[in-house]
């Protein structure tokens, strides 16, 4: 096992929001990122399929001898956390518990994929930590395909956001959890559509904090995002590496080198 080699995985671009939060907090740490772009999105798949995919992806990260697996994908975290724990051969850090720990209000909305919503994983985690909370989960099937297309200013994306937020606003939620790692890219749009008083919770921030003890960064950890380089990061995808690199550039602020990695189908 390589010391402090973090392994991240997601169905595509979304997990880069988690990676970026970690790098901004801890600097340029060695990591491997696997985007399963051949099978994106995960959130519209059946639970058994998601669990099978999680076993394959986490098994591949284990073979890379990572020291910690970061489930940078809410759908697999919701439906296959036990699979990841069994396959990783290393500690596993997920998003859902991190998000629940960040909740500070009683009326909570969750935007997530259909599979994550169907699992009720966010509701269970938030209610366990905050008894008496009202949790409303909203499935957002159109978000990931629209985000992966790369057009963050499309009318279709705005219309989808308005439709998905409507039941949460009707319930007067005080905070909204971004229950998919693609969704932080929607924060500028969501802020336009939400009252200023509604807090937006990005679970990736909680994951970056959980890694404090793992990485043991020297000196105090600044709350201000620090500059980082991608030189110590290896990026792999299961389809279209050039397209992924192009679409990932605005997410990371720099273009990653991306290689093709085939997995069992």
UniProtKB/Swiss-Prot annotation:
Biological processes per GO annotation: cell wall organization; peptidoglycan biosynthetic process; regulation of cell shape
Domain of life: Bacteria
Reaction it catalyzes: L-glutamate = D-glutamate
Record bears the keyword Cell wall biogenesis/degradation: yes
Residues at the catalytic site: 73, 180
Classification via PROSITE patterns: ASP_GLU_RACEMASE_2
Pfam families on file: Asp_Glu_race
Entry function: Provides the (R)-glutamate required for cell wall biosynthesis.
Designated name of the protein: Glutamate racemase
